[in-house]
Amino acid sequence: GLNWSEQGQYLAVGTQSGLVQIWDVEREKLLRTMLGHTARVGAIAWNHHILTTGSRDRNIYHRDVRVPEHHIKTLQAHRQEVCGLKWNAACDQLASGGNDNKLLIWHGLSDTPLHRFNEHTAAVKAIAWSPHQQGLLASGGGTADMKIRFWNTQTGKPLSVIDTGSQVCNLAWNKTSNEIISTHGYSSSNMHNQIQLWRYPSLSQVATLTGHTMRVLYLAMSPSGKSIVTGAGDETLRFWDLNTPAREQQDRMDDRSLQSSFMKLR
């Protein structure tokens, strides 16, 4: 797992062996290596000076990166690998998703979850907090689930569901409008590996984007919120403009090379 600190100065890296590293990227310097996990670290989330990590060892670690004795707390609430973690600094809540199909909400550094959501029927890797409405959380389920679910984490109540018909790999809210972007893998139809844009709360579909030939595991939004980049197992990065009409992908890409193309979303 990889995750930038909020100011973009430090990069946290989770390794296959369970180590967590913090890098100063500008100086190309490894600042510290932290022990604790006993298996791969695939989920990482920052909350100011708190670095939270989730692992295949089923544990969630809270660490204070300012001090030598960094370990604050270990949480043992998932029965399988912790595959999704996202902090919401505005309401001091942490969402954790697991391969046990569970979505848990934690308040601050508490020992026990504030809410437990059991509705997903596959791993919950895709998690995204809305920047537009406090306590609004979206989560996406894997191949046996294929749903995006919305939650009010202030009340602990489920809100609405989108059945996407595809494995949900990643989610991100549009920074400038009340829309959510989802990336996908295996589909029950012939629409595999697509990217979809949904309007909230109407849940109407704004656009469907195709081009990747393997599941779209990675999704990042530009600081301005005007474009996104997606990465897939097909070894391509694709850049999408959020503000202009979608058009068909014309590129013929070499699957073995890392290439990028710029495409219009709508």
Please give the residue ranges for each predicted region.
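Short C-terminal beta-strands that terminate individual repeats in beta-propeller domains
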Residues: L30-G36, G54, H71-A77, G97, ...
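Solenoidal tandem-repeat scaffolds enriched in leucines and small polar residues
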Residues: R32-R116
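Short coil/turn segments that connect the beta-strands within blades of beta-propeller domains
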Residues: Q7-Q9, H48-H49, A90-D92, Q134-G135, ...
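A beta-strand-loop signature enriched in Asp, Gly, Thr, and Trp
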Residues: T112-S177, I181
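Canonical WD40 repeat/beta-propeller blade segments in eukaryotic WD-repeat proteins
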Residues: G1-W4, A39-W46, Q80-W87, A122-W129, ...
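Conserved strand-to-loop turn within each blade of WD40 beta-propeller repeats
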Residues: G14-S17, T53-D57, A90, S96-D100, ...
